């Protein structure tokens, strides 16, 4: 049998890591060790250089002393073990304790795995002999250890250093065994594979923990505030919020932290160390988690999907915030409408929808924004100093995903296809809005009862109630409820028409107008009435047509209550109340309230000429 090194199978826990293990994980560790000792008692094996009898007795004593919980007064907290059944059944472990009060380090592992194992069928029971010489002494503790490999492992100082680096993602590990198990996740060759995302795991316990990211299971509940968590380590970190415990203090600035990983991340703010690099663009990060999030901007991976509206997210925190929008049950409540949010800043941002406050104003175009982050992203479009620059039009973007979306306006690429009808879209959001026409799901409901399939349409609709038009054209003073409409209107002044039809060379100020125009040449009519089968080139025409069947008249006059199928008809009607007459006949100077009335009036002049 080939020899197996200790590092091949060891799982090393620092004191901090051991403290984060759940009761079930510690119980699993204890059960594995007990099963190992039972195997040692009965199997017919002997070791080349060690006698198994004393090892059995030593392991039993050590297990009773050290595997239940870490004692602050007798252990430094580093354990070596957590050996899976498959390895336990093949190799008999050796357990070396360090009993000194200074160290108390537990060396629970397969120290004899460097030796070859022989099965001797001639022996019916374990032989019991005294241990031989213990030539290896720990430099710091002065403890004698009988096996060289145990000494080498024990000698490693518990400084939290992780000398084994993953070449694929730069994550570091304290042992070679941990690194190899991590590499299995990259190569997808672990025996436990997630059916939802395909991620592979070597350990069933890690696989079950991962499954909770999909199922949403949260078995650990805080007794003080009832908040639940999917992982025991997350639960312990949360408990420290209540206790105020911050055991890890920065030596440079004295700032304290509740957990070791946060402390390490903070230390890098002083050293400037950024050990984790993006393999695609080379950008460096101080934390591996941030590297993973960043890499998704290149791959487009969005593993968290909302079941209500289909929106997807790069990371779980954004997904959680989004879900609160649907449920409205966040811990921080709006004083005006009672809606709940996940954090105080979100409440403040929401309250601006009631007050209309938009403190961030762009001095170049007059656009006002509610949030500083939106303002910074917007300014990049003017300054052109964003890291992502379009080679065709020179427009700059601060975010790779926004840049990729913009590129599609030039290439015409439509990577998002509807599975039901095959229609393709350039944006994932456009696909979600389209899919709602099939499913009929409209999760965003207005107080007036009208529902919408997407948030932007809902927000635009809300301005029809408030009458708010914060976006004003500096050329003519015309105001708009949405910045998009102002941008489109501005092009009527500048005559900027960057989008040209390849068939007739007609130019348009907006890309969507070009796409609609192209249907004149292609004859495409993608919008079909379900009642009568009549097809239309534009969605607005279909919606207007459907009102013939439904009898719906959504535009109502506030003064007399008369309703109309189209907003244009309502505007014309309202002039009968105000007396406003904008349309003047050039023949006789008569003023009329609507264009239709003007055309009818002109016919009276034509009759006179005839």
Curated annotation (Swiss-Prot):
One of its GO terms (cellular component) is nucleus. Keywords: DNA-binding, Metal-binding, Nucleus, Repeat, Transcription, Transcription regulation, Zinc, Zinc-finger. Transmembrane segments: none annotated. One of its GO terms (biological process) is regulation of transcription by RNA polymerase II. Residues 4-97 form the KRAB domain. It comes from the Eukaryota. Its main location: nucleus. This is Zinc finger protein 823. It comes from Homo sapiens.
